[in-house]
Design a protein with these regions (language model features):
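N-terminal beta-alpha lobe that positions the nucleotide/phosphoryl donor
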Residues: 2-261, 265-271
Length: 271
């Protein structure tokens, strides 16, 4: 789809390499994109190219016409991921991580339960669906609190609040913009270091590709911050925790394909 702040050229790069890899395996490839500025819409990249908006109505017409073996959503960013639920509901095969796993990763409450089950540390959190619930939760979480809606990437709607007035205003604003959304409130780890791991998994074995350390403190969206590869300031103990957590999370989600996990590190504990 179109370039937006926090979502752009990296997904074009992923799509091109995904198409090339599928072609090498002998598959006919079909690319759907409405952005003429991208490499993935060059005439010689995919076998077939549809210049269509990445909306369900258009996608479904193409799928009915082409009858593909499956659809890959994990290379197109949030725009493509949002289509997974409808693809799953209409019985279209998603190649790679299933819709069930994608939904588990994007639903903040369910994902936090998964962390609890796998003994992975996480900041104290709660899930709220109304402003009253959020205010009640703030009593046990202690400020500052990080507020995030579910089912968004790119840091959309994410804010650190420091008192009840801020919290109420932000929650009301979010629920007006995204009705019926579950909001995750967690205690903001002040002064924590942020790191992230990229890995690839086939559902059985996890291969960690790289671990990056962010220069800016935790809470600044990764699209707005700089990261170094390899990390410049993480000890062996912290690195081992990151590797262990990445392995556990990738396998618990039944990941098939790529996964990116972001961590906060405070007092040598990886959250």
């Amino acid at each position: 789809g179109p370039n937006r702040i926090g979502q752009g050229i990296e997904f074009d790069y992923c799509c091109v390499h995904g198409v090339l890899a599928a072609s090498e395996c002998g598959y006919e490839t079909i690319m759907i994109n409405c952005n003429p500025e991208t490499v993935s819409t060059d005439f010689d990249v995919a076998d077939k190219l549809y210049f269509e908006p990445v909306f369900w109505e258009h996608i479904y017409d193409i799928i009915q016409h082409e009858k593909p073996e499956g659809v890959i959503v994990q290379l197109g960013g949030q725009t493509a991921l949002k289509l997974a639920e409808k693809l799953d509901r209409h019985g279209v095969k998603i190649i790679g991580t299933t819709y069930k796993s994608l939904d588990l990763a994007e639903d903040r409450g369910s994902f936090s339960e998964l962390l609890k089950k796998n003994n992975i540390p996480y900041p104290e959190f709660g899930v709220a669906e109304t402003a009253d619930q959020a205010l009640k939760l703030s009593d046990s979480l202690n400020f500052p609190i990080l507020v995030r809606p579910s089912y968004v990437l790119g840091g959309q709607g994410m804010k650190i609040v420091i008192n009840k007035e801020d919290l109420e205003a932000h929650v009301v604003d979010l629920l007006q913009k995204i009705p019926n959304n579950k909001l995750l409130l967690d205690h903001y780890l002040d002064g924590a270091i942020e790191a992230e791991a990229d890995a690839i998994c086939d559902g059985k074995k996890v291969q960690i590709i790289g671990i990056m350390e962010h220069i800016e403190p935790c809470g600044i969206h990764s699209g707005d911050s700089n990261a170094t590869l390899p990390p410049f300031n993480l000890g062996d103990f912290v690195m081992q925790q990151i590797k262990d957590h990445t392995n556990k999370i990738a396998l618990a989600l039944n990941t098939v394909g790529l996964i990116n996990i972001q961590f906060a590190i405070k007092n040598d504990i990886v959250y």
